[in-house]
């Protein structure tokens, strides 16, 4: 009898957890900011967001310039949020302070940057667990490299995922941001 009770408890717990994850959106998260404080995604309600995992020593690092351009051009309706991560080839080895200095000095980054996180593996940040979860079936799966982009709509829902090779100024991304 105890085994049956335990199995039922586990089943209902897992079912509730799955339902909660499915109903989540970006407004359920906040993250530590690169230069201290917190990035609360509730502050961006009503705007689209482009969430990007970044790195300072990657072949795609020049996308910082395009991301900054995008933020300046569309900042009234779009927020770019960068997430430095050292998951791919050790291409983000710096401290938060070093990353902030690099971004400002080389690209004039003014969009919000989160503190360094892990975007995959056992220590994957909760936000990236949600972004890559099976509930987001069209976008599921591990991040493959730096500068993958996740488009969030004005209601906080994940609506598209773009791989590293997609320029932030790619026509498909710009069109999705303008819709």
Regions found by a protein language model. Name each.
Residues 1-24:
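Bacterial Sec-dependent N-terminal signal peptides
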Residues 19-42, 126:
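N-terminal "domain-start" segment that seeds a small globular fold
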Residues 47-48, 57, 61-86, 103-107:
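Conserved helix-turn-beta segment immediately C-terminal to the redox Cys motif
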Residues 49-52, 79-82, 112-115, 151, ...:
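Structural recognition of the beta-strand scaffold that forms the well-ordered cores
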Residues 77-95, 110-121:
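Thiol-based oxidoreductase modules, predominantly thioredoxin-like and allied folds used
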Residues 97-146:
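Short, internal strand/loop/helix patches
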Residues 126-129, 133-179:
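Thiol-/selenol-based redox modules, centered on thioredoxin-like
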């Amino acid at each position: 009898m105890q085994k049956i009770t335990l199995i039922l408890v586990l089943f209902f717990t897992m079912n509730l957890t799955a339902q909660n994850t499915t109903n989540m959106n970006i407004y359920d998260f906040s993250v530590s900011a690169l230069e201290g404080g917190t990035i609360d995604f509730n502050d961006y309600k009503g705007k689209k967001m482009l969430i990007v995992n970044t790195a300072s020593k990657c072949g795609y690092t020049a996308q910082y310039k395009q991301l900054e351009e995008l933020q300046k051009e569309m900042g009234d309706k779009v927020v770019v949020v960068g997430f430095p991560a050292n998951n791919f080839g050790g291409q983000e080895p710096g401290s938060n302070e070093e990353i902030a200095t690099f971004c400002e000095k080389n690209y004039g980054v003014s969009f919000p940057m989160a503190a360094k996180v892990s975007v995959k593996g056992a220590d994957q940040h909760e936000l990236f667990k949600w972004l890559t979860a099976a509930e987001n079936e069209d976008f599921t799966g591990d991040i493959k490299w730096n500068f993958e982009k996740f488009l969030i709509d004005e209601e906080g829902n994940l609506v598209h995922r773009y791989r590293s090779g997609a320029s932030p100024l790619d026509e498909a991304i710009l069109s999705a941001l303008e819709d």
